[in-house]
Amino acid sequence: MSIRINDLTVRFKNGVVAVNKASLEIPKGIYGLLGENGAGKTTLMRVLTTVLKQTEGMVSLDGILYNEGNYEKIQKKIGYLPQEIDLYPNLTVKECLVYMGGLSGVSRNELEQRITYYLEKTSLTEHQNKKMRQLSGGMKRRVGLIQALLNNPDFLIIDEPTTGLDPEERIRIRNLLVDFSKDRTVLFSTHVVEDLAATCTQLAIMKKGSFLYSGSVSGLLENAKGCVWNCTVQNAEEARLLEANYSISSKQYVKNGIHMKVLSKEKPNENCVPDNDITLEDAYIYLTNS
């Protein structure tokens, strides 16, 4: 299972180009998608879910071209969790999932088994008889993820799946997605870089409608090698000077001053030392700001 995108362009009626000649191949497994707000990630996902038709370019899912004649066939292979989800407020969790699963054409017996399994995996079993309107935002996200998994999709597209979850639940959801991706493709879009560091070996970074990077996480980290510095300054004025001239990925007050992680090809000043413990967040910020 792979998804191929070739010279994809999405241009809206007002002339705004949200995606501009973007090309990418998404292989089996979990594939991360990073980018600032307005980078084009949501538009890309709307195309991949057949909600939005591309203006130009080619997209294919397992060899099936994205066009109106194939949309129904493609939709049967896809599961989708959007960033904003508004499920039926007056239905219970269980009723909502039974209804959504029924729309996907899953048999009742198989549906019951999958609902039971995913309720357990997402720690929602004890909440299955609550009305949707009674749930917290994090719980609604988990229900939304379950509905995206019910048809056992070949291609799962998820937008900010861990929003509103506590650390323990985030880890549970990440582990569930890793297990699910064993024989499938999962496109994982998030602003939480830590989630991608814990789940992905491949990712793409979007900026202004195009892919700034696509490839391995290790390759992205290698790109920032020698460009991450640990600097400790004595006062706020020195800190402001660094912030005015460089990208800063972290800042912390310590006993002997202010510790800052500075991203730069050149050594910022004589007090800075190389940091060889580069994080995915460091590499991402360095790439997008260099």
Regions found by a protein language model. Give the residues of each.
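Conserved ABC transporter NBD signature motif
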Residues: G57-N67, K73-I74
